[in-house]
Amino acid sequence: FPYQGSSIILESGNVNDYEVVYPRKVTALPKGAVQQKYEDTMQYEFKVNGEPVVLHLEKNKGLFSKDYSETHYSPDGRRITTHPLVEDHCYYRGRIRNDADSTASISACNGLKGHFKLRGETYLIEPMKISNSEAHAVYKYENVEKEDEAHKMCGVTQNWESYEPIKKASQLIVTPEHQRYMEIVIVVDHSMYTKYNGDSDKIKTWIYEMSNTIRESYRYLYIDTSVAAIEIWSEKDLINVETSAKNTLESFGEWRARDLIHRISHDNAQLLTATDLDGPTIGLAYVASMCDPKRSVGVVQDHSSVNHLVAITLAHEIAHNLGVRHDEGSCSCGSGYTCIMSPVINPDAMKYFSDCSYIQCWDYIMKENPPCILNKPLRTDTVSTPVSGNELLEAGKDYDRDSSANPCYDAATCKLNQGAQCTAGPCCDQGRFKEEGTICRRARGDDLDDYCNGISGDCPRNPYHA
C-alpha cells in the first residue's frame, strides 16, 4: 500500500499500511424513479493498488423483519418498545465488476464502511476522520494493531463422535426451493451499554453492520436471516451475566423462554456482552437446538473493534444452533481462507462457511426439520388477492416478476404456466430445468465447476468446492 509504515487512527483501531481512496459515485437514478434517501442500487469507482475498481452495491432488502422493533428501559424500569421504519436503510451487499468471485458487505450511511473481496484478497474500507473530505482508507485486517494477541475461541467442546455419520455431499442436494428463514433477536447487556457510553444509536449501528455481514454469510447455506428486534438492557441486566459463558448461556436461555419469546416473534436470540468471558472463550451456544424455547440461543463477547470479526463470531454461534460443528482439517471454504466454523477466531478473512458446515447444517435440517424457520417472513400481515408486479410475494404466488418480460407464468394469477418449471436462472432454459450435470458456473483457479441438478433453475454450489 502507498502508506506503508505509517499509522492512522480509524474507528476499527490503529491501522498500519493503508491506501487512501476517493470513491466516486457513478450511478444515476433511472428516469422517473422515485428519489429515496438510499438508492436500491449504487456503483462507486476507486483504485486499489493502482487498479481501477467498480463496486456494485444492492440494498440488502429483507435485512429487517416486518415487525422489527427496538426496546430499551427507562430509569424506573419500564420497557419502551418502538417499531421504527427501516425500509429505506443504508446497508448493502455487492460485488466488484469483472471479478466473478468477488463479494462485498457495505454500510453506506456515512461514506462506505465494510469489507470486500477483490482478486481473492479481503479488504476493509472506512471513511477517514477528515472533515469535508471524501477520503477513505482501504486496508487489510492484518494491518490493524492488535491490543491482545491471545487466541480467541468458541467455548463449544461437545464430543462430536456421538453424532451419526452425516450424508456424503453427493447425497445431499439443497436448492433454493429448500430455503429457510431465520428471524434473530440481538440482546445487548448492560456492560455493552456502558462500553458504548450509553450511545444507543452507536450500538444499533454496530449491530446493523454485523447483521449485514451475517445475512451475506448465510446466503451460501440457503438460509435467509433477518433482524427481528434489538433489545438494549440500558438500566440493568435482566439476568446474571457472569464471566462463565456456560452459566450466562443457561440464564439467557431461561430468560428467553419465560419472557422474550412471549412478546417478540423470532426464531433465535443472541446475547451480546462486553463482559470478558473466562479464558480465551468469546462465544458459546447450544448445539442442534434451533426453535427450542430455552436452547435456541447463544452468547457472544464484543471482542474486537473490527465489526466483521464480531459478526463472524455471531454467525459461528448461530450455526451451532443449526447443528453445525467445528471444522476439522479436511474442511474447506476456498484456497487460503479460514472458515467461519474454525474453533479459533483467526484474523484472516473469515467470511465463508465450509463444505462441511453446508452438509452438517442441512443434514440437521433434513433430519430434525426445525419448524420455526420454515415460514418466510412477509412484509405485512395482509394476505391480499394475488396480483403480479408488486414487491410482496403474496399467498399462493409462485413468482413476482413483470409478466410482459416473462412468458413462463400467467400474469393474472402469478402462477407458473402449465408445463413451465421455472422462470429464470442459470439452470432455466425456456421455462424448463436444464439437465442434471450441465455446467452452470465455470471454475476459477483450482476450484471446481458448479452443475445444474435438474430440479432447480438456480445454480447450486458444488459441495466439493475447494
From Swiss-Prot:
**What does the entry state regarding organ or tissue expression?**
Expressed by the venom gland.
Q: What is its EC number?
A: 3.4.24.-
Write down the CDD domains for this protein, in alphabetical order. Answer: ZnMc_adamalysin_II_like (cd04269)
Q: What residue stretches are annotated with the Disintegrin domain?
A: 385-466
Residue ranges occupied by any Peptidase M12B domain in the UniProt entry: 180-377
Which InterPro entries does the entry link to? Disintegrin_dom (IPR001762), Disintegrin_dom_sf (IPR036436), MetalloPept_cat_dom_sf (IPR024079), Peptidase_M12B (IPR001590), Peptidase_M12B_N (IPR002870), Reprolysin_adamalysin (IPR034027)
Record's cofactor remark: Binds 1 zinc ion per subunit.
> What does the record give as cofactor?
Zn(2+)
Report motif location: Cell attachment site.
444-446
Show the disulfide pairing: 291-372, 331-356, 333-339, 422-428, 427-452, 440-459
TM stretches of this protein: none
Going by the entry's taxonomy, the superkingdom of the source organism is recorded as Eukaryota
Q: Name one GO molecular function term.
A: toxin activity
Q: List this protein's GO terms for biological process.
A: proteolysis
Chief place where the protein resides: secreted
Q: Which residues bind Ca(2+)?
A: 183, 267, 372, 375
For this protein, the record's Pfam families field holds:
Disintegrin (PF00200), Pep_M12B_propep (PF01562), Reprolysin (PF01421)
Where Zn(2+) binds, per the record, is at 316, 320, 326
Which residues of this protein are catalytic? Answer: 317
Instruction: Give a yes or no for keyword Transmembrane in this entry.
Output: no
What quaternary structure, including any partners, is listed in this protein's UniProt entry? Monomer.
Q: Which family does it belong to?
A: Belongs to the venom metalloproteinase (M12B) family. P-II subfamily. P-IIa sub-subfamily.
Further remarks about this protein from its record: The disintegrin belongs to the medium disintegrin subfamily.
This one is known as Zinc metalloproteinase/disintegrin
- Organism in which the protein naturally occurs: Deinagkistrodon acutus (Hundred-pace snake)
Starting at the broadest rank, the lineage of the source organism is: Eukaryota, Metazoa, Chordata, Craniata, Vertebrata
